[in-house]
Amino acid sequence: HLLDFRKMIRYTTGKEATTSYGAYGCHCGVGGRGAPKXAKFLSYKFSMKKAAAACFKYQFYPNNRCXG
């Protein structure tokens, strides 16, 4: 949940998530649409999608690689 994530950032860093990190990362416009701003983030986005796909294919039966 996005609000929980915001609270976690505030608790962990002491910073307001929206003003401190709102323009950071792969956010490329309203709704996250658009291409990543740097090659670093494009690579990161690909890695995250690959990891999510590896876990989601096992969502209906146990998989030791997916924790959390």
From Swiss-Prot:
The first-level EC class reads hydrolase
pH profile: Optimum pH is 8.5.
Name the reaction it catalyses. a 1,2-diacyl-sn-glycero-3-phosphoethanolamine + H2O = a 1-acyl-sn-glycero-3-phosphoethanolamine + a fatty acid + H(+); 1-hexadecanoyl-2-(9Z-octadecenoyl)-sn-glycero-3-phosphoethanolamine + H2O = 1-hexadecanoyl-sn-glycero-3-phosphoethanolamine + (9Z)-octadecenoate + H(+); 1-hexadecanoyl-2-(9Z,12Z-octadecadienoyl)-sn-glycero-3-phosphoethanolamine + H2O = 1-hexadecanoyl-sn-glycero-3-phosphoethanolamine + (9Z,12Z)-octadecadienoate + H(+); 1-acyl-2-(5Z,8Z,11Z,14Z)-eicosatetraenoyl-sn-glycero-3-phosphoethanolamine + H2O = a 1-acyl-sn-glycero-3-phosphoethanolamine + (5Z,8Z,11Z,14Z)-eicosatetraenoate + H(+)
Write down the superkingdom of origin: Eukaryota
Required cofactors, per record? Ca(2+)
Any GO MF annotation of the entry:
calcium-dependent phospholipase A2 activity
Q: What is its EC number?
A: 3.1.1.4
Q: Where in the cell is it found?
A: Secreted; Cell membrane; Mitochondrion outer membrane
Keywords, ordered alphabetically:
Antimicrobial, Bacteriolytic enzyme, Calcium, Cell membrane, Disulfide bond, Hydrolase, Inflammatory response, Lipid degradation, Lipid metabolism, Membrane, Metal-binding, Mitochondrion, Mitochondrion outer membrane, Phospholipid metabolism, Secreted
Q: Which SUPFAM superfamilies match?
A: Phospholipase A2, PLA2 (SSF48619)
Q: How is the cofactor bound?
A: Binds 1 Ca(2+) ion per subunit.
Family annotation (InterPro entries)? PLipase_A2, PLipase_A2_dom, PLipase_A2_dom_sf
One GO BP on record is: killing of cells of another organism
Gene3D superfamilies assigned: Phospholipase A2 domain (1.20.90.10)
Q: Where does Ca(2+) bind?
A: 27, 29, 31
Query: What family does the Swiss-Prot or TrEMBL record give for this protein?
Result: Belongs to the phospholipase A2 family.
Under which name does UniProt file this protein?
Answer: Phospholipase A2, membrane associated
